[in-house]
Amino acid sequence: MKEDTVILLAEDDDGHATLTRMALREVGVNNQIIRFRDGQETVNFLCGTGQGPSREADVHYLLLLDLRMPKVDGISVLRRIRQDEQLRRMPVVVLSTTDNPHEIKTCKGLHCSCYVVKAAGYEAFAAALQQVKPFLEHSQTPWTTGQS
């Protein structure tokens, strides 16, 4: 597993963020995690806009993306990522509390790497997060644009 891949966790709910961190550790994922509390923070980091920190060009990233966030929702974040030449290959795992077929279809249409429903129980959620591991193994980042 690529432990140098940084996991970006876009999750506004403190409880869900804590459970996600714990569940990842439980399934053996020990990568650095950077958390964003809303979609705008996530976009600012990825695109280098705003006042805060931004992504580093030579770092591998994997985004765990909640759909229901303030300021900018997860689907808008995913759409923005897929429209950006330097971001579009970044693996994005959607974490959602719903298994709504329309939302799943929308996310798959925007080429999310995986759609994980946040299971009601902790053990089931931890098991579901096993799906994240392959994306750490085969990270497509950092991104190259053909320029040196």
PLM feature segments, named:
Residues 21, 35-62:
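Acidic, metal-coordinating helix/loop segments flanking the phosphotransfer/catalytic sites
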Residues 113:
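Short, glycine/charged-rich "phosphate-handling" switch motifs in NTP-dependent
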Residues 67-69:
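Receiver (REC) domain active-site loop signature in two-component systems and cognate sites
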